[in-house]
């Protein structure tokens, strides 16, 4: 039941993330003004703001001017719902669940913004910290206060590792990625610094493999900038799902 509820909640959050993804790079408020069609300016009616369903009923077009509505909107909503449900299945009996739902939402927004605009907005990272810290404290009250120390160490570890890379190669590693690694360390470190190392390793592995494929196929050149935040996010999400099992297997 908790997975179903989180999945439905994720659909709603996904709808809000679409606003975040559109407005944050432009440094606009995510609260006001209400959402409107970018083509005709008519406000989006409540009946047209039902996640996924409204887009399907409208056949991907504005009710007023018939301008096309990007398929990204329902995909973000559906993807967020599915990920929320999956995280709930993995952590349904753990108080750390709310924190990891926050992390999931922030990673979706950061990844899509970085893919489109090549930036990792501080506003989203700040929200991840402001919501994550009290939620992790709440989880630690149930699981043990040592988890907070692990989270703090994880944040320093994630931040420090990528900061070192940035100092050596500033063009290859932006400060947005460095700060994102610190946030990931905060969350993943809750279960130990091994989870932080695994998450970063998977992020670098995925980034390297896809980067080589893009360059090898001629889609990108060595001079092109490839957003790294989506790979860090993917590595973190994989660690949320299989990190503990993998590390237990690795340690024998």
Model-derived features with residue positions:
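Functional transmembrane core segments of multi-pass inner-membrane proteins
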Residues: 6, 109-208, 248-252
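Intramembrane alpha-helical segments
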Residues: 66-142
């Amino acid at each position: 039941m908790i997975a179903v509820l989180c999945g439905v909640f994720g659909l709603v959050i996904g709808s809000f993330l679409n606003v975040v993804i559109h407005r944050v790079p432009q440094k606009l408020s995510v609260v006001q003004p209400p959402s409107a069609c970018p083509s005709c300016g008519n406000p989006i009616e409540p009946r047209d703001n039902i996640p996924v369903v409204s887009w399907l009923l409208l056949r991907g077009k504005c009710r007023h001017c018939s301008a096309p509505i990007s398929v990204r909107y329902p995909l973000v909503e559906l993807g967020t719902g599915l990920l929320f449900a999956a995280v709930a299945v993995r952590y349904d009996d753990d108080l750390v669940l709310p924190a990891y739902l926050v992390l999931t939402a922030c990673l979706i927004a950061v990844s899509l913004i970085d893919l489109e605009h090549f930036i990792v907005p501080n506003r989203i990272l700040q929200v991840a910290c402001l919501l994550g810290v009290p939620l992790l404290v709440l989880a630690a009250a149930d699981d043990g206060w040592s988890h907070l120390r692990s989270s703090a160490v994880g944040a320093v570890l994630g931040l420090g590792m990528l900061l070192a890379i940035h100092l050596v190669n500033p063009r290859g590693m932006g400060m947005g990625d460095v700060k994102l690694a610190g946030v990931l360390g905060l969350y993943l470190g809750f279960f130990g610094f091994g989870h932080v190392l695994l998450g970063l390793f998977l992020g670098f592995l995925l980034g390297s493999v896809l980067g080589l494929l893009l360059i090898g196929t001629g889609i990108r050149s060595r001079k092109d900038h490839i957003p790294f935040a989506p790979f860090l996010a993917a590595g973190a999400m994989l660690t949320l799902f299989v990190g503990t099992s993998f590390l237990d297997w690795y340690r024998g």
